[in-house]
Amino acid sequence: MNQNRPASSPTGKDESELIDFGYRQVPRNDKEAMVADVFSSVAPSYDLMNDLMSAGIHRLWKDALMDWMAPRPEQMLVDLAGGTGDIALRFLKRSGGSAHIIDINADMLAAGKKRAALKPYAAQLQWTVASAQAIPLDDKSADRVTIAFGLRNVTDRMAALREAFRILKPGGRFCCLEFSHISQPQLSALYDIWSFQALPRIGRLVAGDEDAYRYLAESIRQFPDQNTLMGMMAEAGFAQIRYRNLSQGIAAIHSGWKLD
């Protein structure tokens, strides 16, 4: 037996391989725990964090996601990296269906449960600590799958996309809302100043964690651009793939369908 062979993950990846964590390169098998630490740190102020990172515009982006998804009654949503339940709650408000929130971070889910407890549709929510790379749900069990501001934090994004495809019913739809790549250089320069100079300082003052906010800004720049993500979705099996830029590409919604 070869005792020196590299460890491998359930997805067949070499766990000793280096992968991006913001602008740093870290061992693949360390990233998930490092991301979990970041979100444990920011969980109590996560919604405020989104307000700071987007100047409050994330609320309009999430409305745009719901408008494009057009939820229908009795649909079942699986929201990956669902954190505090913001997307699931918006979905239920519009559809009256049900939602299953998946997140690797128990602190984020605890914040979500507390937030949802007084909502009229709290009983229609399920919460599960699990990775988007290994979703503990049956094949063809979801009508819709979403991931909002979470795919860039996933260690193996292709594995997460394939899992989203696996759990969708034929005719089901996947939507990803994520910070993306700005199309106008002038706006990009201003956004860099905000992200790398102002945001970490605000994070230190508001949440007491400058490093977490710096990582989040770096992770946005490391995320694939709009066309690259379309190609990844096609590789995972999705069809009729489209994207819409929001706020000149600061964020984008990607949509894909499982046809059979």
Report the location of each language-model feature:
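Conserved class I S-adenosyl-L-methionine
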Residues: 173-203
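A short acidic, Gly/Pro-enriched loop at the edge of an enzyme's catalytic core
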Residues: 133-144
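Class I SAM-dependent methyltransferase SAM/SAH-binding core
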Residues: 76-134
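N-terminal auxiliary segments of SAM/dcSAM-dependent transferases
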Residues: 1-37
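A short SAM/SAH-binding and catalytic strip from SAM-dependent methyltransferases
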Residues: 143-157, 180
